[in-house]
């Protein structure tokens, strides 16, 4: 609602003369007031008229829109009825097509002979790749076996060489030892003889004998050095031979580790083959499930076709009955129906054209059904071929595993023979090498490790036997699954009959849906009329509510604007006050510092009592002002009268007098604390003001 009011009185000109009596002036003012009121009423009525006119035009437009919507709904109803009729005709055509497709599907059902041929083909296709793979694995195993035997032979050869060299070095050392011991004994005998001679011979002879002995000593020292060099060379050769033996042992250990790694890889391949076999079993199960699903679909389609064929027969029978009735009526009343003959002929032509269209549609649907059936047959054949291929693969794996078992048994026999031969060799070596007991102990430990490894290999062979038995059990379970597939085919034939019954039920549901659709249309028309009436009533109510809400909104908006302006003014005043107070605080702090310096100076000098009392009063006055200022800042919500309380003045005056004996640094700390409290208080005020402004802004929006 728009209401304009006059605020300027200058718009009404004053036509009366300036002079006159007081009665004339009073009547003139009353007349002007009446004129102003009349003009205000006119403008008010004008604004109301314009609003009513706008509402009238809007309502007319809405009325036109509703009429158009009604026409549109009526047209949609007609189109839906036409669509339902077309759907009926299409369903009849599909019924005929499905009957033909059913007959074709019956012809294309797999016989047991065809199934056996497919199984044989799948077995052949699955067996060939698996046989090749197991053959390759056997070749690799033989290759690794040959390498292992070669390494074992080299190891034994190197070991025998090492023992032979060790025995030679021991013999050489023993011979050298015996030789040196005999020489030392001979030298000691010579020494004793010389000593005896020295005791018996004169001094002249002694000098000659000493020289001769010195020469012999030099010769013997040289000979000793030569022997030591030979011993060092022998030691070096011994160390080199030991290093070579250690290198050979390391190489053999490395080769053994590689062989163990190859054995582990072969075991891993075996496990992967087992996993593949399990996966193939799962795939066989999934293919059988798909086969059952497809057969269920086939049975459903057959049931639908049967139901549709029964419907077609009923329709044909009804059509025949109608034609016979028409013929009887035409025979009885030819004179009466001569006028209507042309109409009936035209209707017959239309029916014939419709029949031709339906026939064309039926042929098209037949072609589509044939294609779908072919695709289904292909899928079923592909699934069966995959199942047979998996069976063949499993049989190949079984054969390969049996061959591998035989090889492992042969290896076990060879290992037993080799172990016995090694035991004999070690017993001979133990008898021959009693001098090197520590070395033989180490070798015995290595032999024990090898024996443990052989025992482990035997256990692995037994495990493989158990796995082969498990595979045989799996093959038997797969054969059982094949028999279950044959049973599932019989179940599918039974499910076809169930599908036919489902089609009949669906027909009945279609009829029910049609009747429900007609009822829903009638109810929709009634509800439309009722909703239109309700809509018009609600429209008037909404217009009234909108006007009330707009007025309330304008009032609230004005209030918010005023509150925001007042808040801004308060904030600016508060900030100015804070600035002034901060300046005062700084001035007071400066004065306080000056007074403290003066106090210190006076304390140093002998100040008279009058000056001291005067300064003390001045300090009390400054401290009182400072406390008042602090109470104003720290407690801003207190009324101004409370801050000018004489009791507070007395207490504030008393406190500084009590605090005078404290040192200045304590007063500075207290002052800094008060300033920090002030800052915190100011920050809290700012945050509260911001929150209030945000709340006002959100409510205004």
Curated annotation (Swiss-Prot):
Q: What pathology does the entry list? A: Nephronophthisis 18: An autosomal recessive disorder characterized by chronic tubulointerstitial nephritis resulting in end-stage renal disease in early childhood. Extrarenal manifestations, including intellectual disability or liver changes, may occur in some patients.
Q: Where is the composition biased (Polar residues)?
A: 1-14
Instruction: Tell me its family.
Output: Belongs to the CEP83 family.
GO biological process per UniProt: cilium assembly; establishment of centrosome localization; protein localization to centrosome; vesicle docking
Q: Report quaternary structure and partners.
A: Interacts with CEP164 and IFT20.
Residues where Phosphoserine is found: 698
Main location per UniProt? Answer: cytoplasm
* Coiled-coil stretches: 40-634, 665-698
In Swiss-Prot or TrEMBL terms, this protein is called Centrosomal protein of 83 kDa
Q: Which GO terms describe its molecular function?
A: identical protein binding
Mutating residue 87 to P leads to what result?
In NPHP18; does not affect interaction with CEP164 and IFT20
Its annotated function is as follows: Component of the distal appendage region of the centriole involved in the initiation of primary cilium assembly. May collaborate with IFT20 in the trafficking of ciliary membrane proteins from the Golgi complex to the cilium during the initiation of primary cilium assembly.
User: Cellular component per GO?
Assistant: centriole; centrosome; ciliary transition fiber; cytosol; Golgi apparatus
Carries keyword Coiled coil? yes
Spell out the subcellular localization from the entry. Answer: Cytoplasm, Cytoskeleton, Microtubule organizing center, Centrosome, Centriole
Q: Supply the alphabetized keyword list.
A: Ciliopathy, Cilium biogenesis/degradation, Coiled coil, Cytoplasm, Cytoskeleton, Disease variant, Nephronophthisis, Phosphoprotein
Where are the stretches annotated Disordered?
A: 1-23
Q: Which domain of life is it from?
A: Eukaryota
Database matches in PANTHER family:
CENTROSOMAL PROTEIN OF 83 KDA, NY-REN-58 ANTIGEN
UniProt KW tRNA-binding keyword: no
